[in-house]
């Protein structure tokens, strides 16, 4: 299981992450949005998104590349506008082992940031992972942009 979270202007945007092919994923509907101060809203959204898993998702048709689904939930018109001022994380689970991966915006898009990666001990419950993710999101709103 894998999911993406985006934090932009005090809103947490959590799309379903569709599995296109092996390690290729893309954000799809449904998308949950919660205010970063609403811990219970974020928690419900994360549980629901995790329960959906990574449903099989087709490739885009050749030559047709619509704006990513999360753009409209941020109230912007383009992916580049969305990326500016957005922080992003992944939650990954494999064989009941969880990892939160923070990303930083580089020249070629978001890249995994080893300084923002948390590996949880084997057997850690999803509840602990979700609580930590909520704390990270809420802490990120208290820090100046770019830290």
Placement of each model-derived feature along the sequence:
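Intrinsically disordered, low-complexity regulatory segments enriched in Ser/Thr/Pro
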Residues: 1-40, 91-131, 135, 142-146
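Negatively charged, low-complexity tracts enriched in Asp/Glu with abundant Ser/Thr
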Residues: 32-88, 112-116
């Amino acid at each position: 299981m894998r999911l993406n979270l985006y934090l932009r202007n005090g809103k947490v945007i959590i799309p379903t992450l569709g599995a296109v092919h092996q390690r290729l994923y893309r954000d799809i509907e449904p998308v949950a949005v919660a205010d970063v101060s609403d811990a219970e809203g974020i928690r419900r959204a994360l549980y629901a998104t995790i329960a959906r898993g990574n449903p099989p998702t087709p490739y885009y048709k050749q030559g047709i590349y619509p704006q990513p689904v999360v753009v409209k939930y941020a109230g912007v018109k383009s992916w580049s506008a969305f990326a500016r001022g957005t922080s992003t994380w992944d939650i990954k689970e494999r064989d009941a082992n969880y990892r939160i991966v923070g990303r930083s915006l580089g020249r070629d898009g978001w890249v995994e940031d080893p300084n923002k990666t948390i590996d949880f001990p084997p057997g850690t419950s999803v509840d602990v992972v979700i609580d930590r993710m909520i704390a990270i999101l809420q802490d990120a709103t208290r820090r100046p942009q770019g830290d």
